[in-house]
Amino acid sequence: AIIDYDAGNLKSVEKALKSLNQEVIVSRDSSEILQADKVILPGVGAFGDAMNNLDKFGLVDTIKEVTRKNTPFLGICLGLQLLFDKSDETPGAEGLGILKGEILRIPPKEGLKIPHMGWNSIEIKPQAKLFKDIPNQSYVYFVHSYYLKAQDEQIVAASTEYSTHIHASVESGNVFACQF
């Protein structure tokens, strides 16, 4: 199931999965999401607005339940950021708190534009399940102004450099997430 919370790249994620011959539902119905064998939280937008929408549609507890019951879960872009405690983008707004860490603004650096838009190579940790059979230093496409600083380095599956060290992907049990 792809979670529909009025924020995100739903159609591009749906199209990508269909091109891989996957059965796809796009839903904000908690019972449908809880019955799915895999769940994706996509995202493009602002942290605070996205959390408000998840709350408005009654999806906060649904997402927490999905991640607790061992269903494979993937957060993409803003979907990664929402899994954590808080974001500098919306001070005072609480994230889902499923994983520990914070979302920080990419610091300005001469010669680098923010938002970060473009291809960067990622340093893949050898134990990363999500990137099995993907070569280290592969290039992925980023569009973001905020980055993850995970509290526990053990959950970091891949990282990159852009003005600072960025935790680009994380894995914890059945929960996977990528900033790209």
How does the language model describe each region?
Residues 45-118:
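Cysteine-nucleophile active-site neighborhood
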